Swiss-Prot record:
Protein's recorded name: 5-methyltetrahydropteroyltriglutamate--homocysteine methyltransferase
Highest taxon listed in the record's lineage: Eukaryota
Location of this chain's protein in the cell: Cytoplasm
Reaction(s) catalysed (UniProt annotation): 5-methyltetrahydropteroyltri-L-glutamate + L-homocysteine = tetrahydropteroyltri-L-glutamate + L-methionine
Organism annotation: Plectranthus scutellarioides (Coleus)
């Protein structure tokens, strides 16, 4: 019985890659210094080898993103980056990822329904593909030099094309799969080099097989792997899927592919896939059974997994069953060893990446008759304690959440009348300007927060320092003449963790970091029990900020769906139950802010879209409870209180009616990196009556947009949106940027809004 890991986190146990990247981008270190991060790879390879894993992945390390690595491998560099051929280096690679002073970055979007982001390839009929990055082969050779024979992992050719988009100037209807014949020769070159280097297995990640694919897309898999079959001769080939069930038609296509040795499935989220396997699995093929959750931090229920694996063993045979993770461990934290302060009982319920590889191997050994009772017994005890712990169960919270069913929780007055009442109170100009919430977090500010937590500075010193920072942010916004202000969130390290720390039912890690994009990591809270709010969370800071200005000051909250989707969520009850509990806690906070005189309250639902199930058949149920949760938070406020929400990654065309159904007064949406895809919804006739602020510039790039560029973007919006509902704002919070970038960008944004106001007044 063998063991396999789909992929492993890249950042390192203490985020070594993050700091190396940021040092390189800031010009403080060399390319050679950055390349030393390959040492992280060596540590991880040894970790998996020492744990007894047989099939260890390589080429899952990346300096930014595995899809971008594939774009580099294929030489599919958009012309604006002025790449002239040859091996793609850091300059071109990071320009594609982040933009540079003269050109914007490529689009970034969610990787399926995770909080990881990939760089979307821009393709068309004129792309001249060439083998331009030998990373996959080089990493295999480096691992081999360390004495570890690995399974090189490539993003599969069909998923790569399905996840791409037509480049600028290419018809939106361009059939991306028509490029298969152009990219397969490069895959053949890579395969040939891997064979020559001594590889015996190769893994193609084809996660799009879990989506609702059309027949021509499924046919592309048959075509691609038939074309690659002779090149793959002599290699054992695994096709890996993850994140959901594989639909029956895709399962049939996948398991019928010739020349493929094994198939990997997510059996944590894929209960229906197990039924398909029971209904028929090709004889002589390997089944890589993903029974250890790659996306969460809960210890595996080993007894339950053994039962599942034994049933599968009866179908495929002992020598063809491989125990695996459900997905890459990229989506979980790195190592529990780095959590000495975590509560011991809660810690016993958890497993991070380093622990999950041990679980995988323990399951594989148990199936061969070598069950390690010293490992299995504590696991069984932890599973039992989690079910019965009073820390998990709060009857009052469960009753309050259950009482929510059967009501719409909708504000009585319609949005149009509410906006009129709010305008009378707020007296804003047309095209009002605002920002999304956070302002840059300086080294000094982080030091203050860091020293307050272990009480190296007093509460009085801490409050004084944070108030000074808020005052600085307020004064800057007033100087810039922004209409609706924010306090800049200097007291917050993270928009979810900040709230979770003040809610019951949450636990926190010191080093539970997970990559979001590039060097950006998040440290998701762990929701282990029923959720409630013991006391107000933001009222003190919001009222302090409002006292510093006559302009409206937004109260800033994170919405229940985003808290849910950006946390490691308990897996012992439905997600919607947990979401309703969080919604009730946020509702209490909204009402306390209103009582304290805050007239504009933003409830961010940045992650609403990313929680959307991968299957269309499951969308309606998710959207129903997600939108309902948002409405619960603000159903009790007055008509004159303006409720804002913010959303990230504006691929919203398919859920626009649910967004309208949220019944917010104003929605701001990240839009600038998606070529105004959002605006196409309104061009197609969808009527939106609330305020809306599609982002006018990309905060993920250091590039400072000109006034003319922003004005041009606003004009495009005015072509499809009413003047009286359009807001002008950046597309996301400014926390990760520097003041030297933020100030001129906001100056240009306000100037663009004023320019348009003047032009609109003249036109009247």
């Amino acid at each position: 019985m063998a063991s396999h890991i789909v992929g492993y986190p890249r950042m390192g146990p203490k985020r070594e890659l993050k700091f190396a990247l940021e040092s390189f981008w800031d010009g403080k270190s060399s390319a050679e210094d950055l390349e030393k991060c390959q040492l992280i790879l060596g540590i991880h390879l040894k970790q998996m080898s020492d744990a007894g894993i047989k099939y260890i992945p390589s080429n899952t390390f990346s300096y930014y993103d595995q899809v971008l690595d594939t774009t580099a491998m294929l030489g599919a560099v958009p012309p604006r980056y002025n790449w002239t051929g040859g091996e793609i280096g850091f300059s071109t690679y990071f320009s594609m990822a982040r933009g540079n002073a003269s050109v914007p970055a490529m689009e970034m979007t969610k990787w399926f329904d995770t909080n990881y982001h990939f760089i979307v390839p821009e393709l068309g009929p004129d792309v001249k593909f060439s083998y331009a990055s030998h990373k996959a082969v080089n990493e295999y050779k480096e691992a081999k030099a360390l004495g570890v024979d690995t399974v090189p992992v490539l993003v599969g050719p069909v998923s790569y094309l399905i996840l791409s988009k037509p480049a600028k100037g290419v018809e939106k209807t361009f059939p991306l799969l028509s490029l298969l014949d152009k990219i397969l020769p490069i895959y053949k070159e890579v395969i040939a080099e891997l064979k020559a280097a001594g590889a015996s297995w190769i893994q193609f990640d084809e996660p799009t097989l879990v989506l609702d694919l059309e027949s021509h897309q499924l046919d592309a898999f048959t075509k691609a792997y038939a074309e690659l079959e002779s090149s793959l001769s002599g290699l054992s080939t695994l096709i890996e899927t993850y994140f959901a069930d594989v639909p029956a038609p895709a399962y049939k296509t996948l398991t019928s592919l010739s020349g493929i040795s094994g198939f990997g499935f997510d059996l944590v989220r894929g209960a229906q896939t197990i039924e398909l396997i029971k209904g028929g699995f090709p004889s002589g093929k390997y089944l890589f059974a993903g029974v250890v959750d790659g996306r969460n931090i809960w210890a595996n229920d080993l007894a339950s997994s053994i039962t599942t694996l034994q049933a599968l063993e009866g179908i495929v045979g002992k020598d063809k069953l491989v125990v695996s993770t459900s997905s890459s461990l990229l989506h979980t934290a790195v190592d529990l060893v780095n959590e000495p302060k975590l509560d011991q009982e809660i810690k016993s319920w958890l497993a991070f990446a380093a622990q999950k590889i041990v679980e995988v191997n323990a399951l594989a050994k148990a199936l061969t008759g070598h069950k390690d009772e010293a490992f299995f017994s504590p696991n069984a005890a932890a599973q039992a304690s989690r079910k019965s712990s009073p820390r998990v169960n709060n009857e009052a919270v469960q009753k309050a959440a259950a009482a929510l069913r059967g009501s719409e929780h909708r504000r009585v007055t319609n949005v149009s009348a509410r906006l009129d009442a709010q305008q009378k109170k707020l007296n804003l100009p047309i095209l009002p300007t605002t920002t999304i919430g956070s302002f840059p977090q300086t080294v000094e500010l982080r030091r203050v927060r860091r020293e307050f937590k272990p009480t190296r500075i007093s509460e009085e010193e801490y409050v004084k320092a944070i108030k000074e920072e808020i005052n600085k942010v307020v004064k800057l916004q007033e100087e810039l003449d922004i209409d609706v202000l924010v306090h800049g969130e200097p007291e917050r390290n993270d928009m979810v963790e900040y709230f979770g720390e003040q809610l019951s039912g949450f636990a926190f890690t010191a080093n539970g970091w997970v990559q979001s994009y590039g060097s950006r990591c998040v440290k998701p809270p762990i929701i282990y029990g029923d959720v409630s709010r013991p006391k107000p969370m933001t009222v003190f800071w919001s009222t302090a900020a409002q006292s510093m200005t006559q302009r409206p000051m937004k109260g800033m909250l994170t919405g229940p769906v985003t808290i849910l989707n950006w946390s490691f969520v308990r897996n012992d009850q439905p997600r919607f139950e947990t979401c309703y509990q969080i919604a009730l806690a946020i509702k209490d906070e909204v009402e306390d802010l209103e009582k304290a005189g805050i007239t504009v309250i933003q409830i961010d639902e940045a992650a609403l879209r990313e929680g959307l199930p991968l299957r269309k058949s499951e969308h309606a149920f998710y959207l129903d409870w997600a939108v309902h949760s948002f409405r619960i938070t603000n159903v009790g406020v007055q008509d004159t209180t303006q409720i804002h929400t913010h959303m990230c990654y504006s691929n919203f065309n398919d859920i626009i009616h649910s967004i309208i159904n949220m019944d917010a007064d104003v929605i701001t949406i990240e839009n600038s990196r998606s070529d105004e895809k959002l605006l196409s919804v309104f061009r197609e006739g969808v009527k939106y009556g609330a305020g809306i602020g599609p982002g006018v510039y990309d905060i993920h790039s250091p590039r400072i947009p000109s006034t003319e560029e922003i004005a041009d973007r606003i004009n495009k919006m005015l072509a499809v949106l009413e003047t009286n509902i359009l807001w002008v704002n950046p597309d996301c919070g400014l926390k990760t940027r520097k003041y030297a970038e933020v100030k001129p960008a906001l100056e240009n944004m306000v100037a663009a809004a004023k320019l348009l106001r003047t032009q609109l007044a003249s036109a009247k």
